[in-house]
């Protein structure tokens, strides 16, 4: 099982949906698709070029969160492979889309979908072209009790090599066509609990990008050598990292 594309879903609590969508439209520079779903609960953030990979959902209840969509050729085959690797199926909605809702061994929600996508968008320019930035990583925040199991699981269901960079972080080595990297972070605490996630941005000017997000209403929560943690006006916290955007393989855009 190897997904050909990965999308991140920003799932907002009902009272945070409008403000959350506005913040991420401004933060990414992306447009917004028409809404879809029975109550208009779904939409996609549309980059200036390439295929979309960030989507939004208004939840029926509960707190805001992130979940992943893994795009696969055959949902039934992918479900079988994911379950064999330790996933639990939590829903198989009726309808033409034929998607499946699952949870990882540590309880992180994800979906298997068949929507086609192939072209990774270029980073967005800011400050008159002085710097660029992009949302290019989902970091899974993993309690120690399930860390090793989650690393093995996500490497298996993506087919991406797990490459530890420290006791705290493990990178999954993405193919050049993927718009999102996956980073697995071992939390210090709590010892147990469900796996959660947050978005990470890369930029050619971390300080300027941080200031831009603060001007959009985000609040700086903490600064570290490799990243800055921000709390948006609505939704989950996210990070602006010290990484610069990875180059895009021209052949992957042909």
Regions found by a protein language model. Give the residues of each.
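Core segments of cupin and vicinal oxygen chelate
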Residues: 1-52, 77-78, 84, 90-100, ...
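N-terminal beta-strand motif that seeds the catalytic metal site of vicinal oxygen chelate
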Residues: 1-21, 66, 113-152, 157, ...
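Conserved short beta-strand elements that form part of the metal-binding/catalytic scaffold
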Residues: 28-64, 108-116, 160-195, 231-247
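Generic beta-strand structural signal
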Residues: 66, 98-100, 108, 136, ...
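Hydrophobic, ordered structural segments
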Residues: 71-76, 84-118
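Short proline/glycine-enriched turn/loop motifs at strand-loop junctions of beta-rich domains
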Residues: 72-75, 203-207
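C-terminal functional regions that serve as terminal interaction/effector modules
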Residues: 198-206, 212, 219-223, 229-248
């Amino acid at each position: 099982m190897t997904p050909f594309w990965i999308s991140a879903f920003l799932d907002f609590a009902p009272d945070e949906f409008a403000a959350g969508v506005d913040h991420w439209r401004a933060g990414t520079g992306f447009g917004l698709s028409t809404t879809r779903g029975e109550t208009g609960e779904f939409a996609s953030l549309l980059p200036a070029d390439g295929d979309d990979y960030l989507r939004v959902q208004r939840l029926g209840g509960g707190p805001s969160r992130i979940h992943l969509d893994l795009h696969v050729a055959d949902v039934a085959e992918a479900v079988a492979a994911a379950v064999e690797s330790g996933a639990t199926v939590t829903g198989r909605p009726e309808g033409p889309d034929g998607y499946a809702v699952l949870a990882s061994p540590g309880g992180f929600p994800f979906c298997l979908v068949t929507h086609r996508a192939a072209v990774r968008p270029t980073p967005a320019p800011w400050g008159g072209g002085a710097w660029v930035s992009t949302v290019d990583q989902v970091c899974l925040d993993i309690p120690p009790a399930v860390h090793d199991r989650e690393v093995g699981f996500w490497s298996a269901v993506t087919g991406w090599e797990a490459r530890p960079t420290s006791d705290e972080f493990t990178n999954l080595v993405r193919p050049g066509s993927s718009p999102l990297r996956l980073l697995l972070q071992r939390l210090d605490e709590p010892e147990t609990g469900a796996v959660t996630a947050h978005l990470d941005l890369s930029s050619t000017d971390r300080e300027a990008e941080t200031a831009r997000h603060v001007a959009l209403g985000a609040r700086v929560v903490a600064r570290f050598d490799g990243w800055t943690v921000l709390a948006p006006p609505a939704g989950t916290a996210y990070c602006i990292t010290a990484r610069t955007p990875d180059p895009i393989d021209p052949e992957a855009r042909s």
